[in-house]
Each structure stands twice: as structure tokens, then as C-alpha cells.
UniProtKB/Swiss-Prot annotation, chains A, B, C:
Post-translational modification: Proteolytically processed from a single precursor to produce an acidic and a basic chain that are linked by a disulfide bond.
Region described as IgE-binding: spans on this chain: 118-132, 145-159, 161-175, 225-239, 281-295, 510-524
Compositionally skewed regions (Basic and acidic residues) per UniProt: 339-350
GO biological process: protein hexamerization; seed development
Family named by the database record: Belongs to the 11S seed storage protein (globulins) family.
Ranges of residues in domain Cupin type-1: 37-312, 380-529
Signal peptide region: 1-20
Motif (NGXEET): 367-372
Record keywords: Allergen, Disulfide bond, Seed storage protein, Signal, Storage protein
Chain spans, region Disordered: 111-194, 238-293, 311-361
Name of protein: Prunin 1 Pru du 6.0101
Subunit structure: Hexamer of two trimers; each subunit is composed of an acidic and a basic chain derived from a single precursor and linked by a disulfide bond.
Molecular function GO terms recorded: nutrient reservoir activity
């Protein structure tokens, strides 16, 4: 019996020690044991005051192999997703709803009044503000109350002016605005915010903080892809979210891979599903989980030149709302008018950017922070059917997003694709030449098969709405939409990902001489010709067997 | 005895568990345990119907450290190496023979008639073909037989015209060709093929499929280097070959590192040497090993719009010819005229490419697939002695290939070198500054010494024809040709690999002040001067001890 | 008891086998277990004849995670640090002293006479030298003695001329210099050397050899950072130093990670501190440790065309001075005049370089070795207070070095920063957006806190002069200078590293709308306004709590 004990202890040690070692080796650099892929729903959920964050377990072999992590964020009406940044560049696809997103670039100017109001007013405002700040500096805190009052009035007036429209503002002459008005202008000034809506793709570089707010009338749902194996991430392959406010739970704290919290929290081995609204032990400890929390409160207060009470608020102590909070009343800040104007504004910005970039010889970030990030376009809508790059009336349509239509993607080395296949429509069998593809099923269903280098189907599944699956680089894949059609969004881990089709007018087969086909496949030349010319569609293939002459 | 059992079981577990763990850590990112290098012949062989594929075990520490894999492919006369692609960019050196290579870029036009015949004819042809295809679409399959007959006649005629030469074609006026001729033109149309011959280097990007065919009168032998640790490979460090036809064996299935075949094949632990013509168990299982094999036959047939029988042929079921097959009769397809014209054609293409690239600011792939890959030059011959970049009449010559003479190498981040040293000629001791060097011995023999950072010779060997060895980055190396001379080809894992010599006119020693040498090596100033000036050759050093005044 | 034996053997095996496995997994690609950081002094020291080399243990988790290694080199007066190169690009910061550094680029011309004397003289000299070399070739060795004598005289004369100054030289007409003088000019010719002094940063690419010499009147102290996880290093993550002279000890031979020496040296497990002046076992073995040592002596002699005795001297046999040697007398070589002229010279070079680079479209190394490395500027002084990029009269100043002011850093993908904070001055809390920061404390002390993604302080320490600590990418950090002020140098692992501040005029907080702050931190709008506007300084924050109006 003692021997048995020795033996099992031995076993235990071996499996504790070595298997742990093996587990952490599944990084893409080491080994991709892709014997079996699976389309999966998220397997971890964090409940917050005004929404929830669901994550896919990034320790799964397919995620490890592709070097990605993914999450789905649901923000309720009037919910604010607290500012955070990540160690990996990410693409966000807005599955549903409307809202506002603010990305913060330290050192960039707080442009949000100027860009929406007449520049003349903006200039006056700035001078005024400059003056006010000096007064504030000289007169100290006592003036605070009064200023705030002024500002509230100014804000109301400012909003009225906005609604009167831009035309009127431009009509106002240089000196047309009475001096008095300026005293009641709104005071708030901040960096650019961006409207987001269903179909938008937002690109966020590693280390860049962003927040978002649902000001629509339904839930705002977004799917995020983190490219953890990107060159921009110099830490390890674990996705890490750094929150700058609140007392958030770790979204990716799965399977004990991430560091255990320092205080007041036991490791939760094997517990993937977080209990919602669990008693937060941090509260008793008086320690939050955001970046401010780790600083000495006194030192932080000194650095910010505020009192320690405010510093403690930054540190998120006694905050149990988690990372998505409910805003008291409506969130009230300077916002751009929606729609056409915004689009024109962005187009102008983009033109300017491209001119700059041509002068720079295509070198992004070459001229420092100010000339690039501050004016960088971060989003593009690919939900509009008119925007389709590939369209087959009887099969479906595909829209692609790459560095040509969203230049920041060149820097991030990511691209994306959104597709809608009609019932039984077939996505031509193909392989991804230079990227992994991470596919999220927006709506509908499809039969998907993925094939490895040995000719084995490592994925053969009916994928459903809300699931996500990975098609590794170079692996063959075929997809056929189900009865409900198939609507998906695909993240690709290269700036201009492209595919090589195995059927259709641009397929591999078409590129080969007839006799090579005939010999390779042991078929007649007639059959070879059929292989080459029986399909006139390119990527979106209709399912009917009849020949068509559509070119 | 029971104790002994426990003990050995323990040991077993430890070595099974932990050593396996250690083994898979030898990726370049982790550790290079380069205590001993060795020049080796391939240690795995796959016999196919019309040739063989030999591979070097990529799990060896030196290969793992350098992040490369290598194979040698022998194609018999009239043999066709089936189309395949790899997860790693590769360089192919043609050691012997002649043939044709076709690289497939999905979406690129099928240009092979136009580029070899007059453009006027090509245009007419295209229109005709367009018309024929529409007819085909309208009239369906019945016409197939007839078309094929027409086409055969057209092909014969086409070949006659080719032999009449290009000049005559150009003399023919716009309308000079009778309408009747066009009906008998050859029909086949496919992507560019490239003639290959001894001394050619061909660059194939990751994920790009290619096939090759031996139409010469001797065996076609090629050595392939796969740069698996390239950024272009987002999978793991294992080389993977994806075949698009046939029922191939896994060329790199060594030491159980690759995934075992899903069906019908047991793991073959430790069995490096494949039995030739082994009974293929796939045949009984009815499952092939190419990419098509993994798709559902019915779905594949639907996608291709062919019958299921043809789809099954694509899947390579019941095919036991392996990856190199014997062509029935001669492989008959549109081919470019050989020699001077081809060269001129390519040069024109290259000029155009360079102009484009200058306009683009040197950004390859920046403008999408069509403008780059489709017109990209993939090969360059470095076998011609006249082409030598370094030549020493009494020692030997070296030709280099980098992104300047083959621009795609900038994109692939690879370069190459071919050298021929006369008997006793010395390759100056040197180190590779920015690349690993993987050297294949084409002919002859040499004494090679490689030195690590501790001053230890980790390779000291008489290398022979057919062997391959790795000189890791920064390691010192010296080579002296043997009695038969020394002819080699070196793959380098950086686009413009360069070396730093330790002897010769451009050596490290020459760059140092006399007194630094005198003090560092505890020698007199006179000796220091000798170190600097006793060798007037640069890299290829003659072995005689006499001083020479050649500068 | 036997059982106990089995058990402990088991344990032993498990811990030997598996823990070793775990240890080597701490590469950045795998896992960053950064639960605890620490500012540390070097923990390994090698004593040499004229100085010492101290290294930080690169196997520590923080170094492994950041992919860096570091050393501090102290060269005594008249000491020569023998030529070496490394597998990683490095930045060298000169903490103290003056000296000369020579970087060797194989194949670049030996330009050092021309650039320091009048070009007219230089031209004559070159012609003369050419002639002399030919004579040497023709007349062989007998002339050696005589030449050397001439040269010594020439050298003395040359130095006098230098001291007479450059103006005079330029006044001398084309033919003004008597023929006789030219016969007595100094003979030595070598590649460019560069003067180094306190405050200089020198960038050395991977695989590029350099040597340095202390010709000042105090110790020359330098701190080196090696970016081992750089793309330029294709070997593993271990820093490797390849010496080209002497019989050096392995500076980074810690914890048995590096390969044990082949001969005559036992593994020294756990022995971090090297005994100074230990009996060198190599002497008995007759084998050195530099790159030449590993070559066959006869073959080396043949390659260099020198006798075997000289070859043996190159191999460093019987040399026990280690890597820093004392020069006999003064090291006597061609040197540039110091100061203003040098600066002007470099500025001219830089202008030229930038013009070239604009023409090249910003593509470094695109045109081969000759046009880039040979004329590349390698150093820049950031010690001068006037050079500050950020300055706050009551807090301190910061100078940054990136690819804009030292273009080679774009190629190396490194940047740097030097800062001086006055007593109690605060470096604004911030995070590194795109780089790790490796900080060396030059003088003074500071309180430093580093915070991870869970809000835990993983570093909270009073850092002292001579210590080094790592601030990982994206981790929050705050620093407050102690009573003695705080002077530091920070290496950053990205070409244009930038930070995002959490306090100050450009902070994250300032970019957010008031109401977002109010809701996120559960504070009033007034408090939110204070958070945004209470600090007018940007990065260097003064510690006093009073409000200031300085903008």
C-alpha cells in the first residue's frame, strides 16, 4: 500500500509538473495540435451593472495556434463600458445597436468642439478657456462652483446651437456672435468621439484606451478579436485588459493561466463560468482592480494635484458595478451630428491623411504621434449591402475591409470580411493564403468543413448564430449556408489577407493546363475542361446544379 | 521487485513526459542547443510513381534552431510533381535537368497564349474563347466532344505557328489572319508556366501552389528550403505540405511530430525510412490525402458543378501513384519558346515591375493581388559562371541572389548564394551577420569548421556531395575545398544576407588600427601589418602561401 | 527506507527534469509570469586585466519577458575592450568617462585619415599608401622593419600637424607641402573610430563587431542593453557575445543556460559571482575562447597568409587578460579632432544620409551594405541639459532619442530616454503604449511603482544608483524622485516608443468628457474638472500641492 502511495504520488507529480509544462507550450511558435476544431459559443461570462462580457477560452488549442482571443460585449441602454486598453491590437465588429466610442491618444489635442462648431467660435472658445484656466490657477478652488454653473448654462445653449445646424453657424460673421454668448458657452472639451452602429468595424491599436456608451434604444452588442500574437504585443500570448476605472473582473481569467489576484481572491481552478453578482471580496480589502488601484493613493493624489478622496475614487475602491456601468441620467457630452456630415468630415480627413502618407512614402507612425494617430480613421461600416465587393445574385455577397479602405489596418496587420450567403449558397472551397480567419456567425447557420494537410476534415459542423470558429492559415475550407442563410463576420490576421479558391471562375483549377488536370486527377480532357469552366461565379456560388452562362 | 517496478515506471513516466516536453521546446524562440552540428544526407525517403522525395529531419536541433526544413525532389523523365503549397516560403534550387514549373495565383488571369503569340492574335483568341464559353453555357455538354476535336487540331496548328517564329507573327497585319484559322486555334488557356533548368533558383511564397514537370532527357533534381520560422507562416514551426491532387504521403511525417493520419494508418515511431511501394492502406479506406479529400464529395461536386465521379477523382481515392506521377504520353500544353526571347520578356517585365514599385514607394503587396503577384518574377539563374559576383582566378567564384536581382526575395526575406571553389580554395573565415546559412553540397567536397561564441568548433567535418549543413547566424565558419573542388548552394534566411570576413582585403582585421591589433593579439606592429595586408583577395582565397600583389 | 529512496529519487527526477523544462519556457512568446518585479544590481561579475564586466541575470522572469539582457562595463584608464559582436542589437549608454569606439563594417572602406586631415593631404596619402603597399607586395617582408621606422616618425610628425590645427592645413596650397614630408607621414589606415563621452548613446546592430578604448583620465563606464527578442536575432533568446580576440570568459554564462565550455571547465551550478583572477584552466589546455580559437590553426594561418605563430596569437592561447586588456603605453592610432569640428562633420554626414534616405523612400538597407552601414551615424549625445525635450523648471527634464534624431534606431527598432528629476519631482503616472522600458539609475534615487492589469503593484521599491528595473509594456508606472534627485537612462524596445500619461496636461483624463469621468469614478462634475485641469505640467510634475498656472 505504501508502494501504491509512492506510485500515485509519483504520477501526481509527473502530471502536475510535466503536463503543466506541456500545456503552456501550445503557443503558435511551438506547436499547433489541430486535430479537431470546433465552432463554439463563449464559455465565460462576467455580469456587470449594465451589461455583460463573454469570452472564448483563449487556452483552447485553436485559439493558441492562431494567436487570437475573442470576446462579446453586450452594453445595455445607457450603459458605459469603462475605459480600458489591451496588450493586443483588436478589431471590434458592432453586431447590433448604436452608440458612441471614444479612443484616447495621449498628447493629441482635445478637438471636440472645434470640429463640430465653426472654427471661429472654437478659436474664441480656446482663448476663453485658456483665460479661465489661468484664472482658475490664480484664484484657486473657490471659483470652481461658479464656473461649473456657467458651464452648465453654456452647455444647454451650445446644444441648442448645434440643433440649429451648421449652416447657421457658418453664416455668423467673424464678429457676429455677441460677447455675452461666449460667457455661456459650454465648457467641456475632450478628444474626438465616434458614433458606432451595426455593421461598423473599429480598429484599436495595442495600448490605446477606449470607452463606449450605448445611447441607442436597444442593446449594443460587439464582438472583439484580439490578435495577441501580433508584433505590437511584446508581452506574452495571454490577452490582458487594463482598465482605467472601476473595479473590474478579469475577463480572460480562465484556467488559472493569468495571474491570480494578489489580494482577497482564491484561485478558481476549472471554474469557467463566473457567478454573476458574486460577493466581491475586494470591497472588504479596499483594493480595486484598475491601473490606478496599484499606485499609492497619496502619491497619486499628489501627481494629479487632487485630494486623496478623489484619488481613492479613481482607484475604484468600493465600486461593485464591474466594467459596464449604468449612467445616471443621460451621458451628456459634446457629440458630432449624425449621418451625412460625419461621413463627409471623415472623408475629408481621410484624403488629408492619404496625402500625408504619400508624402511620407507610406511610412505609418514615421513622423511621430501627432501627425498620425491623432487624425487616424479608426472605423468603417461594412454592413451596407451596396458596399459588396463580391456579389452573386443567386448565392450571396461579401464585403472586405483591408488597408486600402481603412489604412490603420496596414499598421495593425489585420483585415476583415463580412458576408451574407443566401439559403444553400456555397462559399467556394478555398484556403487562406497568408492569414488565419476567425469567423463569427452573426445570423443563420452553415455547414462548414475545414481540411488539414493530410486531407482530414478537422472541422465538420453545422455552425449556428453566436458561434465562433477558426480557419487556420492554408487549411482548406468549404461553407454552405443553411436554410436560414448565413451571415458572418471574419477577422483575418494579416493586413491584406487573400484566399485561393478551389472552385469558380478564378479557381486554382482554371490556372492549370488541361492535360495537367487530366493526368493529375486521372480524368479525361473533357472532364478537365468541365472542372475549369463549369462554374462562372467566383467565390459566392449558387447551389443549383444547372449550368449558367453568367460571367 | 515491486519497488523496482515502481521505480522504473517512475523513470519511464519522467522520461516520457518530460523529455517529450523538452523536445518540443527546441524552437528558435526558446533555445538553440547547438553543441554539435553535422552535415547530413536526407534521412527520409518517399518513393512515388515517377520520382522520389527525400527530406531532412526538421526535428534535428540545428534545423529547429534555424527555423528551416529541407527536401530533395527527384522527378524522372515525363514525371509530374503534383500541385502543392506549403505553410512556409521556399527557395528551390535546380541541381540538375530541365523542366517546366507552374505557380498558381488565384485570381490572376490565364495569360498563357497571349504572352507567347502576337497580342493581336491573343485578343482575337480571347474574344473567340469568350464566345465559345457562352455557347458552352447555352448549349450544354453535348458540344464537348466536338470542341475537344477542334481544339486538338488547333493545338497542332498553334505549335507550327510558334515554330515559324515570332517575327512572322508580328508581320501579320491586324486583319491579315483569315477567319477560318481562328476556328482551329488551340483552346487550352492557363496561367503562366516557367521553364526551369540547372542553376535556376525559384522562389515560392507561403500558400502559393505550384507544380512541375520534367520534359528533359535526364532526371530533374531540385533541393527545396522551407523557411518555417518566417513571418509568413502563422502556423507552427512544422513544415506542412498541402497537396491539391493525388494521394500523397506526408513528406515531413517524422518522429511522430506531425499529426497522425486520421484513418487507416498507425503511427510509425522511429521509422525514418519509408518502405517504397508499401501497401497503401488508404486504398481500402477509400480516402485520399489531398485537400479535396477532406470535403464532402457531394458538396464538392455541387461547388464545382461536376458529377460526383469527377469529384471523387479530385479527392484522389484509389490513387496510389504518390506525389510524383508518370504522364501518359507527353504532357501537352502551351509553352513559351525557350532561350533569348524568354529572357527579354522577363527583363521587360522586371523593368515594368521596378517602375511600379518605385511609384509605390517600395511597398510590395501594397496594392493588392493583381498588381503584384500576377506579374512577379519568381526565378533567376545563378549557375552561369559569367554571372559571378566574386571571382578569384586561383580560388573560385561566388554568385549571389538577393532582393536586388530577384525582387520577390524582399517580400520573402530570403536570399541565396552559389559558389564553386577550386581544389584547396578557401572560403575566407567569416560570420553571417544577419542570417542563417543552409548549405547544400552540389558537387565535390570541403572541410568545414563552424565555431560558436565560446570558441568551440561545433562542426568540423569533411562534407560531401548531397549533404546539407547549417551555419547558424553569427557563428564563425571556414571552408576549404577538397581535391575535387567544392560546389555548393546556400540558402540564407534574410533578404540581403551579408557576411563579415576574418581574412582577406575586406576583413575585420583590416578595419582595426595597427596598435589595436598589436595589443589585442600580443603581436608586434609588423605582425599586425601582415595580418592586415598579407591577403589581397577578398572572399575566395587561393591556398598557396606566397604573397601576391594583386589588389 | 528503500521506498523513501524511490520516492526521493522520483522527486529528484521530477524536479530536475520538469523544472528545467519549465524554466526554459519563460520566453516572451510563452508566458510572462510577472507577479513580482525588482530593481536589481548586476549579479555576475567578470574581472579583466583593465576593467570589469557585470551582467544582470537574463534568466530572471522580467528579463525573459521583456526579451532583453543587460551589462555594465567598466574600462580602466588605458584599457581596451576587445572587439566583439553580439546576436542582438544593442544600445550603449556612456555613464562616465571618455574614450574611443570603433565599429567594424566588413567591406566598408578604411576612411580614417582622410576625414580628419585636409582632403588634399588625404588624397596624397592614399596614393602614397597604395604605392607603399605595392612595394610591400613586390619587395616582400624585408622592407617591413624600415617601413615601420618611417611610419613611427611619420606618426609623430602627423600628430604635431594635427595640433597646429586644421586651419593651417587648409591654408597650405595644393602643392605647398614638401615632398619630403609625405615620406614621413604615418602609415596606419583603418575604419572610422568615434569619440565617446558621458551622455552618449551608441547603437550597435546585431552581428556588428566593435571595440572601445579608454583614453580619458577616469574610468569609462557604460551600460549595454541587448534586445535579444529582436527580429535581427535569429538565434534563441540567450544573449551571446562573440569575441574576436583574447581568451574571454562568457559574460552571460549564468545558471547553466549557456553551453558549457567544451574543454577544461566544469559547470558552475548556482555560482553567480565569478571569482576574480581565478586560475584559468584554458591556459593548460592551450585553447582560447574567441572565434578564431575554434578554427584549425594551420588552416587559419593559410587563410590569413601568416605563419602559424601569428595564427596562434589570434586564437588567444595563453592569454589570461580576459576581455578588457591594458594597453602598453598609449594606444596610438589616427583619431579625429575633438569637439565642435566633429559635431559639424557628423551633422554634414547626417544631412547627406537623410537626403539619401528620402530618395530611397525611407528604406534602410535597401541598397546594400555600402550605401548604408558605411556612412551610418551610430551615436548621439543626450546628456546635455539644453537638449531637453520636456522641461519643467520645478520638476525636471527629459531628453528622448528615437529614429528621428538617430536614424539607425528605425532599423534596430529601439529608442531611448534620459531624464533628470529634481528632489520629489514626479514622473507622471503613465503606461508604455508600444514598448518595454528598461531603466538604469544613473544617480540619485526614486520611489517606483509598477502596476499590472489586475491593479496589483508588482514593483514598489526605492530604487538606487546602479540598479536596473524593467517596466513591461502597458503596465502602469509612477516614479517620484528621492532626496538626491533621480537621474536615469531608459532603453525602449521600439523605435518610436511612446507613453500615455495618467496625470498632467496631456493625460488620458483630459481626453474624456466630464460626465464620463463623473460616472466612471462616481465623482461630481467639479471633481472631474479638477482631475482634468489641476495639473498644467505634462510629464515632469512638480511635487508641491499648490496649484500653479504655468502652462
Amino acid at each position: 500500500m505504501a508502494k501504491a502511495f509512492v506510485f500515485s504520488l509519483c504520477l501526481l507529480l509527473v502530471f502536475n509538473g510535466c503536463l503543466a509544462a506541456r500545456q503552456s507550450q501550445l503557443s503558435p511558435q511551438n506547436q499547433c495540435q489541430l486535430n479537431q476544431l470546433q465552432a463554439r459559443e463563449p464559455d465565460n461570462r462576467i455580469q456587470a451593472e449594465a451589461g455583460q462580457i463573454e469570452t472564448w477560452n483563449f487556452n483552447q488549442e485553436d485559439f493558441q495556434c492562431a494567436g487570437v482571443a475573442a470576446s462579446r460585449i453586450t452594453i445595455q441602454r445607457n450603459g458605459l463600458h469603462l475605459p480600458s486598453y489591451s496588450n493586443a491590437p483588436q478589431l471590434i465588429y458592432i453586431v447590433q445597436g448604436r452608440g458612441v466610442l471614444g479612443a484616447v491618444f495621449s498628447g493629441c489635442p482635445e478637438t471636440f468642439e472645434e470640429s463640430q462648431q465653426s472654427s471661429q467660435q472654437g478659436r474664441q472658445q480656446e482663448q476663453e478657456q485658456e483665460r479661465q484656466q489661468q484664472q482658475q490657477g490664480e484664484q484657486g478652488r473657490q471659483q470652481g462652483q461658479q464656473e461649473q454653473q456657467q458651464e452648465r448654462q453654456g452647455r444647454q445653449q451650445g446644444r441648442q446651437q448645434q440643433e440649429e445646424g451648421r449652416q447657421q453657424e457658418q453664416q455668423q460673421g467673424q464678429q457676429g456672435r455677441p460677447q455675452q454668448q461666449q460667457q455661456f458657452r459650454q465648457f467641456d472639451r475632450h478628444q474626438k468621439t465616434r458614433r458606432i452602429r451595426e455593421g461598423d468595424v473599429v480598429a484599436i491599436p495595442a495600448g490605446v484606451a477606449y470607452w463606449s456608451y450605448n445611447d441607442g434604444d436597444q442593446e449594443l452588442v460587439a464582438v472583439n478579436l484580439f490578435h495577441v500574437s501580433s508584433d505590437h504585443n511584446q508581452l506574452d500570448q495571454n490577452p490582458r485588459k487594463f482598465y482605467l476605472a472601476g473595479n473590474p473582473e478579469n475577463e480572460f481569467n480562465q484556467q488559472g493561466q493569468s495571474q491570480p489576484r494578489q489580494q482577497g481572491e482564491q484561485g478558481r481552478p476549472g471554474q469557467h463560468q463566473q457567478p454573476f453578482g458574486r460577493p466581491r471580496q475586494q470591497e472588504q480589502q479596499g483594493s480595486g482592480n484598475n491601473v490606478f488601484s496599484g499606485f499609492n493613493t497619496q502619491l497619486l493624489a499628489q501627481a494629479l494635484n487632487v485630494n486623496e478622496e478623489t484619488a481613492r475614487n479613481l482607484q475604484g475602491q468600493n465600486d461593485n458595478r464591474n466594467q459596464i456601468i449604468r449612467v445616471r441620467g443621460n451621458l451628456d457630452f459634446v457629440q458630432p451630428p449624425r449621418g451625412r456630415q460625419e461621413r463627409e468630415h471623415e472623408e475629408r480627413q481621410q484624403e488629408q491623411l492619404q496625402q500625408e502618407r504619400q508624402q511620407q512614402g507610406g511610412q505609418l507612425m514615421a513622423n511621430g504621434l501627432e501627425e498620425t494617430f491623432c487624425s487616424l480613421r479608426l472605423k468603417e461600416n461594412i454592413g451596407n449591402p451596396e458596399r459588396a465587393d463580391i456579389f452573386s445574385p443567386r448565392a450571396g455577397r461579401i464585403s472586405t475591409l483591408n488597408s486600402h479602405n481603412l489604412p490603420i489596418l496596414r499598421f495593425l496587420r489585420l483585415s476583415a470580411e463580412r458576408g451574407f450567403f443566401y439559403r444553400n449558397g456555397i462559399y467556394s472551397p478555398h484556403w487562406n493564403v497568408n492569414a488565419h480567419s476567425v469567423v463569427y456567425v452573426i445570423r443563420g447557420n452553415a455547414r462548414v468543413q475545414v481540411v488539414n494537410e493530410n486531407g482530414d476534415a478537422i472541422l465538420d459542423q453545422e455552425v449556428q448564430q453566436g458561434q465562433l470558429f477558426i480557419v487556420p492559415q492554408n487549411h482548406g475550407v468549404i461553407q454552405q449556408a443553411g436554410n436560414q442563410g448565413f451571415e458572418y463576420f471574419a477577422f483575418k490576421t494579416e493586413e491584406n489577407a487573400f484566399i485561393n479558391t478551389l472552385a469558380g471562375r478564378t479557381s486554382f483549377l482554371r490556372a492549370l493546363p488541361d492535360e495537367v488536370l487530366a493526368n493529375a486527377y486521372q480524368i479525361s480532357r473533357e472532364q478537365a475542361r468541365q472542372l475549369k469552366y463549369n462554374r462562372q461565379e467566383t467565390i459566392a456560388l449558387s447551389s443549383s446544379q444547372q449550368r449558367r452562362a453568367v460571367v
